[in-house]
C-alpha cells in the first residue's frame, strides 16, 4: 500500500517504533472491498428509502425533546438520528452511563454532551424509551 502525504505530515507519524508509527496507511487507500461494500450500502439506503426513516426519527425526536429544559442544560440539539443534550458542567453527567444501562439504554456521555445516535431501524417505542431515560436523569 502507498499513502501520500506532505513531508510535515510524514515526519509527524514516522517512527521505527511500531508503537508510535502511523499504522493506518491502508485505512486511507481506496480498498476495493471497502468501496464495493460502500456502494452496496448506498444502493440499500436508496432502495429502502432510509431518508423517510430519518425524517420519522427526527419528527419523533422533536416531539419528545423540544421544550425539554433544565437549569443545567445549555441546549438540546437534534439533527437526523442524532440528539445532543449539552450541559454547562460535565459533572452533571457523572453516573449517567450506569443509570441508563440499568434502564436498558447503552449511552456514554462525552464531556458536556449526553447524546444519542439512533440506528435508522429503531422502533418508535425504543426511541421514546431512550428519551424518557435522558429526561428522567434530570428529573430525579
Residue map of PLM features:
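Conserved N-terminal phosphate-binding loop of PLP-dependent enzymes in the Aspartate aminotransferase
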Residues: 1-140
Amino acid at each position: 500500500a502507498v499513502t501520500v502525504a506532505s513531508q510535515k505530515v510524514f515526519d509527524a507519524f514516522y517512527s521505527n517504533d511500531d508503537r508510535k508509527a502511523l499504522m493506518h496507511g491502508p485505512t486511507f487507500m481506496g480498498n476495493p472491498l471497502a468501496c464495493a461494500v460502500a456502494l452496496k450500502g448506498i444502493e440499500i439506503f436508496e432502495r429502502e428509502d432510509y431518508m423517510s426513516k430519518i425524517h420519522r426519527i427526527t419528527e419523533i425526536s422533536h416531539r419528545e425533546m423540544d421544550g425539554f429544559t433544565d437549569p443545567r442544560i445549555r441546549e438540546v440539539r437534534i439533527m437526523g438520528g442524532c440528539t445532543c443534550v449539552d450541559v454547562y458542567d460535565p459533572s452533571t453527567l457523572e453516573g449517567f452511563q450506569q443509570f441508563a444501562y440499568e434502564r436498558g439504554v447503552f449511552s456514554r456521555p462525552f464531556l458536556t454532551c449526553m447524546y444519542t445516535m439512533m440506528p435508522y431501524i429503531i422502533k418508535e417505542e425504543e426511541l421514546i424509551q431512550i428519551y424518557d431515560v435522558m429526561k428522567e436523569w434530570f428529573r430525579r
